[in-house]
Amino acid sequence: MSASVAAPPPALSRKAEFKAAKAELLARFQTATNVTPLMHALSRATDDALRRLWHECGLPATLALVAVGGFGRGELSPHSDVDILVLLPDAHARELDERIERFIGMAWDLGLEIGSSVRTVDQCIEEASQDVTVQTSLLEARRIVGSTALFERFMLRYREALDARAFFQAKVLEMRQRHAKFQDTPYSLEPNVKESPGGLRDLQTILWIARAAGFGSSWRELDTRGLITDREARELRRNEGFLKTLRARLHVIAGRRQDILVFDLQTQAAESFGYRPTPAKRASEQLMRRYYWAAKAVTQLATILIQNIEAQLFPATSGVTRVLSPGRFVEKQGMLEIAADDVFERHPDAILEAFLLYEATRGVKGLSARTLRALYNSRDVMNNAWRRDPRNRHTFMQILQQPEGITHAFRLMNQTSVLGRYLLNFRRIVGQMQHDLYHVYTVDQHILMVLRNIRRFAVAEHAHEYPFCSQLIVNFERPWVLYVAALFHDIAKGRGGDHSALGMTDARRFCREHGIEGGDAALVVWLVQHHLTMSQVAQKQDTSDPEVIKRFADLVGNERRLTALYLLTVADIRGTSPKVWNTWKGKLLEDLYRATLAVLGGAQPDAHSELKTRQEEALALLRLETVPPDAHRALWDQLDVGYFLRHDAADIAWQTRVLYRHVAADTAIVRARPSPVGDALQVLVYVKDRSDLFAGICAYFDRNGLSVLDARVNTTRHGYALDNFIVTQTERDVQYRDIANLVEQQLAARLAESAPLPEPSKGRLSRLSRTFPITPRVDLRADERGQYYILSVSANDRPGLLYSIARVLAEHRVGVHAARINTLGERVEDVFMLDGTGLSDNRLQIQVETELLRAIAV
């Protein structure tokens, strides 16, 4: 008897068939260099599947199934939504509703991510008039199956109702609002390939506006119309192709709709494009640089196109308002306009002049589309001869030396690629991401952010932000020297080697070529060479040690250098990430500045005189607090010189006022107050010392979501620990005054317990840290005097890290004398001063280092 195999149910067969067809296309998406034909093929396969379902559901010929949005355009990324409109005649039988619901349900069953609407023609027109998003999706409507007459009637009504001018204004406003959500920059760490500035949505917006205005629906048609040039059309197609391919590969790699280029996928996406890591750059950094360049080009060309379309839709009624540079530039409706299309070809020196005029001319708010286009198409003019032209070098220095508008001018020069063509080494770092868990901007954006920060110090309306910096820069002669240093301080990033040394060479050449001589040139070069030094000294060294201050003062040499380095350092740290700067770092830097300035002014770094000064200032404060005249002696007699040097007079007075009655306390005394230096909590702990005390305090802070910024640990002569911590709450918007009492009670109770130290919790790393982990490092060495050991730790930041370190030290009975906790974005670079007892044993040193590496490993 012959066996027969039953045919699969139609639904299963249909689903398997579509799934197989889609899988074959997805496999090709992974390697295709041009995905547009595949997007069309996926759209056609989806059309076919929907037609079959339409007929199976018995939907009448009087209805129409319409593709809208990207599906209407005939382009589907691997996991894009499939947007459809079921177009109804004005009158229809109610039983059709059930069939339509069945059709949509079967489409979902097929595996399609359906976005559906069911409307009559009148309803479509009404919805479109109320919502520009609906109006946009219908702009590219395409009939799949059903009534041609109904569809054509709908399109006729739609076109009649479409107001091209109103549509233009609505879409431009929508684009600006969308850009604002992404901080108006394409240079996000995790850009949205579709929605971010310079992404696919910007290109689609231009084509929607052009289509609505009747100017065409492709780059070729816009070229024919004269809205763009052949070269611009090629650039647009090339960058659009790259962005489409990148988006499609993200979908395939993620196995779902994924438009954000998240850290987790950047390496895989880079490898799919053939990028491989080099000693200087990760594969992901190479891909991101290509993405940023594409987004930058799209932004440039979109600006030109939108202005051109606007000029066609809203013809200007007035002509030239004033001549700014005879035969070269005029102002037209607040925009800088070239006098003739070939100005830059005939006068290459006019290229930089354009930015000088933009910067220096009141009422000029930007460059016109005509000027932007001429700049874009003058790239061949910006050659070696142009860079060497003394006129251009003079103009560039004029741009740097203007009293205002410098930041805007340099940003515009970068956006138009002129800055990178004038400074070729700057061009090398445009779009270069730094996956160092510290910087959140590309190198070029970071440099311009530092320039902006220095300029901001000099602007009166921003003086309240950093009053000390503003006070210093007002009296700083020729501040443009700082701007040059800002331009070059990181210009050598990504080349391999020491970027400070390489950048110093670039800066020296720039100064020589631009007539910067003598002390100004020497200062620029010195600042680039040492731009990291002040931060490292302030955050990693014991600045209470007079020798540390003396060495730094010897390096700096004079007040002008000190002030310049301080201003550059503050601007640099603030320009890395919104998370890195805090008031505590500001205090460390300002304290170092003031201490160094005193030495440069002739003050001798003498510990005895400094101790005497601090004590006198503290006593004056205690008298104001009505503390009895000799009450401080009981406590002060138990404190060494190091205590008085590590604390300022205000802290000494506060701690003395709290403790002078409790010098021999039987129980722990814990006091907390909002930190005088900024948004943090200052915590004082006074208790009989023990080897696990520091670890126990860190355990409490860890369990309660408090991050330690600074720890100053002191042991009195009679065996008490007098420890001072600066901590912050990881949750935002906390009122430290409200939690001070709670910390005092809970921490005192915790210290009264005799329980063993708990196991450290290995908190979760951020996605950035998981994707780009740094190699943990531990360095343990004796200090120069042999009195203490210095422990340096660098690792990915995570909850519980400090306690993990403290616990290892406690287990080996290694005392912590001081700690500088330096959090740089997603990484930490902590420095501990340890008691030297026992650490002279090399075997113990190796054991401690090994266990620390194990404790901080991710």
Curated annotation (Swiss-Prot):
Keyword vocabulary terms for this entry: Hydrolase, Magnesium, Multifunctional enzyme, Nucleotidyltransferase, Repeat, Transferase
Annotated stretches, region: Uridylyl-removing: 325-681
GO terms of molecular function: [protein-PII] uridylyltransferase activity; phosphoric diester hydrolase activity
Residue span, HD domain: 443-565
Domain ACT: 682-761, 790-858
UniProt activity-regulation remark: Uridylyltransferase (UTase) activity is inhibited by glutamine, while glutamine activates uridylyl-removing (UR) activity.
Domain comment (free text): Has four distinct domains: an N-terminal nucleotidyltransferase (NT) domain responsible for UTase activity, a central HD domain that encodes UR activity, and two C-terminal ACT domains that seem to have a role in glutamine sensing.
Primary role: Modifies, by uridylylation and deuridylylation, the PII regulatory proteins (GlnB and homologs), in response to the nitrogen status of the cell that GlnD senses through the glutamine level. Under low glutamine levels, catalyzes the conversion of the PII proteins and UTP to PII-UMP and PPi, while under higher glutamine levels, GlnD hydrolyzes PII-UMP to PII and UMP (deuridylylation). Thus, controls uridylylation state and activity of the PII proteins, and plays an important role in the regulation of nitrogen assimilation and metabolism.
Protein name: Bifunctional uridylyltransferase/uridylyl-removing enzyme
Species, as recorded: Burkholderia thailandensis (strain ATCC 700388 / DSM 13276 / CCUG 48851 / CIP 106301 / E264)
Taxonomic lineage: Bacteria, Pseudomonadati, Pseudomonadota, Betaproteobacteria, Burkholderiales
